[in-house]
Amino acid sequence: MIQNKESLFIPDSSSEVVIQGPSKNITISNQHPITFMLGLNVLEDESVVETCLEEITRVFSKHKASVIFKASFDKANRSSHQSRRGPGLQEGLSRLNYIRSHYQYPILTDLHTEAQAAPVAEVADILQIPAFLCRQSDLIRAAAETNKPLHIKKMQMLAPYEMKAIIEKCNSFGNEQVILCERGTSFGYGRLILDPLSLAEMKHFTVPISLDVSHALQFPGVGDVQRVCAGGRSSYTLPLAYAGISQGISAVFIECHPQPEQAWCDGACALPLSSLDYVVEHIINLDRFIKAQPPTLVKRET
């Protein structure tokens, strides 16, 4: 019989990462209300981007939650040479800068090379390191030395405990503003799964933890015969989000699209824009319930 559970269990807590947005700051922490990292997979035609932004604005003016707009200027890691990649660095950053100033949303976008770090940091409020590149030391260094907050996705083949070394790598380059993102784990060929305990384990590192719901729903490499697009199961967006939010995390990362079947990239994983209001409302409700409970007591493995 355990007489003193505090001797075996520790309160689960995290540091805070403050995003200095164009109109207000957003504090990202596992103890704060959930933040939404929301938008398109890649910058598409302006009409598609505008439709997405208008609905995001409508939904979040109603629900009063913090939102960060995300979109890529270049999908550099597509499987096929036929896959659409986006507008590229110069045009893409110009469009993201317009979105930031016109809609007043903080911007999250990813980079793939060291040379992109400085120009991306001039526009983006959070720099994202893609999962496949999360161990690239030169890329981590270039991103860290911009002194911008970093959103680092856990590679699909890594164990959660391996992410501690990546946090330490960022810290060694002078950047302690790190958010770790779970985006699913490889489970055989063409399949990803979410292990909720991965989120709980990474919370021991005392940094904010996010869940990339959309890409955890992906079927890599099995979307079509030509392998131009990945498959996915976006109809499970809310159940998977619930699994992550129940762990008391800082943010959810969700891609949406007005017509997912016509999306340039990962349309099978994208939440239909028409479902955004419903999904956001239910995520907020569960997050409030979870964070209203006493601090979770989690055994630290020795």
Please give the residue ranges for each predicted region.
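Catalytic alpha/beta core domains of metabolic enzymes, predominantly
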Residues: 146-256
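Glycine-rich, proline-tolerant flexible connector loops at the mouths of alpha/beta enzymes
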Residues: 36-49, 67-89, 256-266
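Glycine-rich anion/phosphate-binding loops
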Residues: 42-56, 87-94, 231-239
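Alpha-helix-loop-beta-strand connector modules within alpha/beta enzyme cores
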Residues: 54-58, 62-63, 82-108, 143-149, ...
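Structural preference for beta-strand elements that scaffold enzyme active sites
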Residues: 33-37, 66-70, 106-108, 125-126, ...
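N-terminal amphipathic alpha-helix/helix-capping segment at the start of soluble metabolic enzymes
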Residues: 2-36, 94, 290-302
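Catalytic beta/alpha-barrel core
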Residues: 86-88, 102-116, 125-139, 148-160, ...
